[in-house]
Amino acid sequence: MYLIKQLLLLFLRLMLWLSSILFVSSPAMAEDELSGSLPEFSMGETLSFSKQPLYKTGLKEWGSLNVRGVATGLFLNQSNPITGNDFSYTNFTNAQLIIENNEGPIRVFAQTGLYDVPVLGLSFTRTRDNTERSYGYLPQAYISIVPENHWSLMVGKLPAIGGAEPTFTYQNSNIQRGLLWAQTNSVSRGVQLNFVDGSLSASLSLNDGAYSNVYNWIGGAVGLKATEKSTYMMSWTGSVSANASNSYVTPLLQNNSQISNLIYKYSGDYWTLMPYLQYTYIPQRPTVGIKGSSGTVGSAILATYHITPLTDGVAPARHLSIATRVEYESSYGNSLANAAPNGVLYGPGSSAWSISITPTLQVDNFFARTEIAYVKAFNMQSGSGFGSGGTMNNQARVVIEIGLLY
């Protein structure tokens, strides 16, 4: 444990040095305190769980055990459906129970049930197929050991380091995940060491990347809270050796990649803004069929306007908001991998942009929202785009999601 602490502190010093170069900061940053610990199950700005969980019981010195419920469904209509997709779907997107104990020296988190993860620019998969082909009926489950206020150690199926968007629909201000999200990991099995001290938070992780069951990924993240409303975040995570795994949940190229992010977030009572940059790199690894190097460069801004404003960051019982996401991503290089001929986007050297607009209404436990989204690709490889033959360069979607959060 001493060696791990020293490595984490060394990492923090490096990230602080980088922060002094990349950001204009003030001495006040060291005096502000983060509200709570590192986020383990984050939620967006437009939806929130009820204050009272579905079920709660006391565990004496171990704190209380909370049980929360999620039930959501959607209607999706799209133009130029990808081969194998229909023009429209009606589907349950989440039927989950979340069990957590966030007090005491030993804490647990378990998320169980069905889930769908619609992604811009990718084929739509129904909920049961997505659940069984990805992380199973227990997508996240871990134990967190908290020996003191500053340190914690998480072990199990963890939310992955990297990227700016969580995985599940109700965790986000937009219904669908974005172009940049598709290059990152969602759930990884492994261990993660967390540190929090005032305005500084950090984590280090050893994990299996894109759920490959090969523990050859390391990652680190740091957050600096500049003011009560502004936070800077940086992360790096990546594969340190070749891995031949290639499946629905473990794509060959993404599972051999390295991911870097720079994120800024402003949280106000009327506006939430989060611009971020993302860079991915896939090194040449001939032993697993990756004969060349490639990667992506992307940028995005996520903005939410709270028509009914928050009060000190807390949403009212009747909350009306509009979330918008605009992003651009380009690919470079060519991995020359027979198992992934289209590369990481729509072919080597391709690029794409997207926009999503999501008006949302939440009243107590119930919410309803609609989303209009559009993706356009450029310089795409023949057969890698939209439509039955993969020859169309754009796709529009209209999505409606309703649900209950307890």
Please state what every model-predicted region is:
Residues 161-162, 240-242:
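Short gly/pro/ser/thr-enriched loop/turn and capping motifs at secondary-structure boundaries
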Residues 1-7, 11-75, 79, 406:
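N-terminal periplasmic/intermembrane-space "pro-region" immediately following the signal or transit peptide
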Residues 54-219, 223-229, 311-315, 323, ...:
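Outer membrane beta-barrel
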Residues 33-41, 81-85, 127-134, 232-236, ...:
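Outer-membrane beta-barrel pore domains
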Residues 195, 204-208, 222-224, 234-238, ...:
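Short, structured patches in soluble enzyme cores that scaffold and shape functional sites
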Residues 213-215, 243, 284-285:
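Extracytoplasmic/secreted cell-surface and envelope-processing proteins
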